[in-house]
From Swiss-Prot:
One of its GO terms (cellular component) is mitochondrion. This is Dihydrofolate reductase. Substrate binds at D29, M30, A31, W32, F33, R34, R78. One of its GO terms (biological process) is dihydrofolate metabolic process. Pathway: Cofactor biosynthesis; tetrahydrofolate biosynthesis; 5,6,7,8-tetrahydrofolate from 7,8-dihydrofolate: step 1/1. Residues 1-201 form the DHFR domain. Belongs to the dihydrofolate reductase family.
Amino acid sequence: MLALVVALASHRGIGNANALPWPRPLAADMAWFRTLSQSIPLISPDRIALAPSASNAVVMGRRTWDSIPSRFRPLANRINVVLSRGPARSTENTFFIQTFEALDSLPLPPSSMTFVIGGRDVYSLALESGRPHLIFATEVFESPECDVFFPHIDWASYEKRDITRDVSRLIDRTLASAFYSPETATFTENGTSFKMFLYTKPETR
């Protein structure tokens, strides 16, 4: 199954000038992405749990790949898949493909998850593919200047679930203690507040 992972502003902006639109990276959100993308989500009516997995894939566009500092590429403990029109050589843990459909030809274990992590065009391809999917969204309560926005979708066709409390339990405890407020079930870093949500279609439950 596909899972889209995105951090977006109140107006659905996801980027500005080839960078995230918030002044500083959000440590708790980054920790959640790292933990989630190395796990299989176990979703029950009352909680979210994670089962570790070293065979998941992260799918991204070439600009997203290039935006990752070289010392962190490829993303560890995950199969990295980069959609790129230009020529590039695949390696043991990184595959360069030219179409979204080429995912089906990659040696991904059937039990693995495929996490789509941006940018906008890759999100669009995932949504247009018709594949069952989840959306893990970190929603930032700000509307900063953005020049890239998440694709338009009918959000009302998804069931929205606040998983912020679950995330506070699943990420590094030091980060949770520093940035999570149990009273409001909200993370706040450097004056920026945000929550995590899971969007599901009824047919993917």
